[in-house]
UniProtKB/Swiss-Prot annotation:
PANTHER family: L-2-HYDROXYCARBOXYLATE DEHYDROGENASE (NAD(P)(+)), L-LACTATE DEHYDROGENASE
Pathway: Fermentation; pyruvate fermentation to lactate; (S)-lactate from pyruvate: step 1/1
Name of this chain's protein: L-lactate dehydrogenase
Active site residues according to the UniProt entry: 182
Residues that coordinate or bind NAD(+): 14-150
Record-linked InterPro entries: L-lactate/malate_DH, Lactate/malate_DH_C, Lactate/malate_DH_N, Lactate_DH/Glyco_Ohase_4_C, Malate_DH_type3, NAD(P)-bd_dom_sf
High-level lineage: Eukaryota, Sar, Alveolata, Apicomplexa, Aconoidasida
Keywords: NAD, Oxidoreductase, Pyruvate
Subunit structure: Homotetramer.
Example GO molecular function: L-lactate dehydrogenase activity
Source organism of the structure: Plasmodium falciparum (isolate CDC / Honduras)
Length: 316
């Protein structure tokens, strides 16, 4: 019998806690919750371990304050980093402020991955994710197919949900693509949206949703994180679920087509930069990078997204 997968969560905050719970519920493997905060990951691990009973699972869940526990990891999920600039109010900071802070963290984590688990599959969540995933790729030395960033899986889940609520259909029946980057420059591809396999344009033609309503949904999708923050909360449940969907496709060799931040090597006319596009995730990691045939307007927006990633990368 093959041993359980070892999944290390580097960062045991809100997202890390939900991910650990989902891993146990799905019986995906043994979990190590790592954090630099003393004792906290151990407490979360103990609490989470009790859910094995209700989940009919048998996953070991442990806490750690040492990078040595990365040793032998099959999957490493990195959420560690600053989510806002220290000493600045919500109105005073932007994502540029995070770059030098989280850059240092990616360099540190990358060195420990290289030392302890160079064959692991890496999922990066730390923002700005399209920049951070490239930094971690460079400093960890893992192959290009073994590292991706969160983005499109989360962004499209929001878009699909909003459209489903307007049309009163099952959210899972909505299919959509958001590419380019995770952030304000994300590219929402209207002509790729389908509902139950039917092009969304048919629903527009039948006056079940208007172009204006769709644009409002697009705007809400782009600004969802801010909307949640303004409601005095933070987004962590849906991000955790999106990440675990990615990890599960790798661990179970499901070969799901998911939109992730991956290394572009000529796709869309860009190279040596991470960007969001559909990929096939299986036991070999990124097994295919799918390049969509964008029209001129879509391509221009994609180029803007990559240009913004390059601008931030230069600041890091």
């Amino acid at each position: 019998m093959a041993p359980k997968a070892k999944i290390v969560l580097v960062g045991s905050g809100m997202i890390g806690g939900v991910m650990a719970t989902l891993i146990v519920q799905k019986n995906l493997g043994d979990v190590v919750l790592f954090d630099i905060v003393k004792n906290m990951p151990h407490g979360k691990a103990l609490d989470t371990s009790h859910t094995n009973v209700m989940a009919y699972s048998n996953c070991k869940v442990s806490g750690s304050n040492t990078y040595d526990d990365l040793a032998g990891a099959d999957v490493v999920i990195v959420t560690a980093g600053f989510t806002k600039a220290p000493g600045k109010s919500d109105k005073e900071w932007n994502r540029d402020d995070l770059l030098p802070l989280n850059n240092k963290i990616m360099i540190e984590i990358g060195g420990h991955i290289k030392k302890n688990c160079p064959n692991a599959f890496i999922i990066v969540v730390t923002n700005p994710v399209d920049v951070m995933v490239q930094l971690l790729h460079q400093h960890s030395g893992v192959p290009k197919n073994k590292i991706i960033g969160l983005g499109g899986v989360l962004d499209t889940s929001r878009l699909k949900y909003y459209i489903s609520q307007k049309l009163n259909v099952c959210p899972r029946d909505v299919n959509a693509h958001i590419v380019g980057a995770h952030g304000n420059k994300m590219v929402l591809l209207k002509r790729y949206i389908t509902v139950g396999g039917i092009p969304l344009q048919e629903f527009i033609n039948n006056k079940l949703i208007s172009d204006a309503e769709l644009e409002a949904i697009f705007d809400r999708t782009v600004n969802t994180a801010l909307e949640i923050v303004n409601l005095h909360a933070s987004p962590y449940v849906a991000p955790a679920a999106a990440i675990i969907e990615m990890a599960e496709s790798y661990l179970k060799d499901l070969k799901k087509v998911l939109i992730c931040s991956t290394l572009l090597e000529g796709q869309y006319g860009h190279s040596d930069i991470f960007g969001g596009t559909p990929v096939v995730l299986g036991a070999n990691g990124v097994e295919q990078v799918i390049e969509l045939q964008l029209n001129s307007e879509e391509k221009a927006k994609f180029d803007e997204a990559i240009a913004e990633t390059k601008r931030m990368k230069a600041l890091a």
